[in-house]
Curated annotation (Swiss-Prot):
<feature type="binding site">
    <location>
        <position position="85"/>
    </location>
    <ligand>
        <name>ATP</name>
    </ligand>
</feature>
<dbReference type="InterPro" id="IPR023005">
    <property type="entry name" value="Nucleoside_diP_kinase_AS"/>
</dbReference>
<feature type="binding site">
    <location>
        <position position="112"/>
    </location>
    <ligand>
        <name>ATP</name>
    </ligand>
</feature>
<feature type="binding site">
    <location>
        <position position="91"/>
    </location>
    <ligand>
        <name>ATP</name>
    </ligand>
</feature>
<keyword id="KW-0597">Phosphoprotein</keyword>
<dbReference type="GO" id="GO:0005524">
    <property type="term" value="F:ATP binding"/>
</dbReference>
<dbReference type="GO" id="GO:0006228">
    <property type="term" value="P:UTP biosynthetic process"/>
</dbReference>
<keyword id="KW-0808">Transferase</keyword>
<feature type="active site" description="Pros-phosphohistidine intermediate">
    <location>
        <position position="115"/>
    </location>
</feature>
<dbReference type="InterPro" id="IPR036850">
    <property type="entry name" value="NDK-like_dom_sf"/>
</dbReference>
<keyword id="KW-0479">Metal-binding</keyword>
<keyword id="KW-0460">Magnesium</keyword>
<keyword id="KW-0546">Nucleotide metabolism</keyword>
<dbReference type="InterPro" id="IPR001564">
    <property type="entry name" value="Nucleoside_diP_kinase"/>
</dbReference>
<keyword id="KW-0547">Nucleotide-binding</keyword>
<dbReference type="GO" id="GO:0004550">
    <property type="term" value="F:nucleoside diphosphate kinase activity"/>
</dbReference>
<keyword id="KW-0418">Kinase</keyword>
């Protein structure tokens, strides 16, 4: 099964959207195998957004992600990355379809509620950045036989 990293950003946490987001992912059939409410250090934020280092908006990304608590998660399932990206919607909430998390709750690109890995490589890197191996609980659920 594929794993993906998803993070409710500070705006989503402050707007109390964690429960709604968890519900959408669970109803879709993904399995939560790791989760924690945490503050992101500047060092971790810089590593998380390293592909944007040197771009004009890099500082804003780091400032925003360190401005308050985030809810970091690891989800597992068939095509988990693509499924999560579909649930999340386009980066710019104004372009995100209704029914997606960003389409329903996002206001503008700078505060777009949620982050999701965009490839197996970024998922592995982000999971390793935010979680220790012993923080992930992989358990074969009986429901998997009804989904996959």
């Amino acid at each position: 099964m594929e794993k993906t990293f998803v993070m409710v950003k500070p705006d989503g946490v402050q707007r109390q959207l964690i429960g709604e987001i968890l519900l959408r992912f669970e109803r879709k059939g993904l399995q939560l195998i790791g989760a924690k409410l945490m503050k992101v250090s500047e060092e971790t934020a810089g590593e998380h957004y390293k592909e944007h280092n040197g771009k004009p908006f890099f500082g804003e990304l780091v400032d925003f992600i360190t401005s308050g608590p985030v809810f970091a998660m690891v989800w597992e399932g068939e095509d988990a990355i693509a499924v999560a990206r579909q649930l999340i919607g386009k980066t710019n909430p104004k372009e995100a379809l209704p029914g997606t998390i960003r389409g329903d709750f996002g206001m503008f690109v700078g505060k777009n509620i949620i982050h999701g890995s965009d490839s197996p490589e970024s998922a592995a890197r982000e999971i390793n950045l935010f979680f220790k191996e012993d923080e992930l609980v992989e358990d074969e659920k009986l429901m998997n036989q009804w989904i996959y």
